Every structure is written in C-alpha cells, then in structure tokens.
Amino acid sequence: LTCVTSKSIFGITTENCPDGQNLCFKKWYYLNHRYSDITWGCAATCPKPTNVRETIHCCETDKCNE
C-alpha cells in the first residue's frame, strides 16, 4: 500500500507502508474557518479523533488519502 505523507505546491510525497499497516489516513484540525495542521500517513488501525475539531479519514487503496 502506498500512502501520501505530505503535499506542497511541488506535488505529493508518498511512502510504501510497512507490513501490518494496511490503511492510509488523513487527519486535519479545524481552526478559524480553515483547515490546518494536516497529517497524512500509514496506520494499522484508523486513528480516533482526540477532540471535536479534529477529522480523520481512513481508506485502503493507494494514495487514497491525498
């Protein structure tokens, strides 16, 4: 599985997930009418939001967390 780990004006950076990590995730924190502090990566299980302003999307196909 290949997941996006960062995005910039120059494109995306990806990584091949290690064995046992079969999910891609994108986590972002909502603040002041815009999304900030976005995190991408691989996971074995879908992370849980730590507060009401945090949103997490998990998926199972290559680069699905773009």
UniProtKB/Swiss-Prot annotation:
Transmembrane segments: none annotated. InterPro entries: Snake_3FTx (IPR003571), Snake_toxin-like_sf (IPR045860), Snake_toxin_con_site (IPR018354), Toxin_cobra-type (IPR054131). Gene3D superfamilies: CD59. It comes from the Eukaryota. Pfam families: Toxin_cobra-type. It is found in: Secreted. GO terms for cellular component: extracellular region. Keywords: Disulfide bond, G-protein coupled receptor impairing toxin, Neurotoxin, Postsynaptic neurotoxin, Secreted, Toxin. PROSITE patterns: SNAKE_TOXIN (PS00272). Its main location: secreted. Disulfide bonds join 3-24, 17-42, 46-58, 59-64. Expressed by the venom gland. Selectively binds with high-affinity to the a2B-adrenoceptor subtype (ADRA2B). The toxin reversibly binds to ADRA2B, and its mode of inhibition is non-competitive. The toxin has also been described to bind with high affinity to all muscarinic receptor subtypes (Ki=23 nM (on CHRM1), Ki=44 nM (on CHRM2), Ki=3 nM (on CHRM3), Ki=5 nM (on CHRM4), and Ki=8 nM (on CHRM5)) but no other data support these affinity values. Belongs to the three-finger toxin family. Short-chain subfamily. Aminergic toxin sub-subfamily. Negative results: does not affect most adrenoceptors (ADRA1A, ADRA1B, ADRA2A and ADRA2C) and muscarinic receptors. Does not affect beta-1 (ADRB1) and beta-2 (ADRB2) adrenoceptors. This is Muscarinic toxin alpha. It comes from Dendroaspis polylepis polylepis (Black mamba).
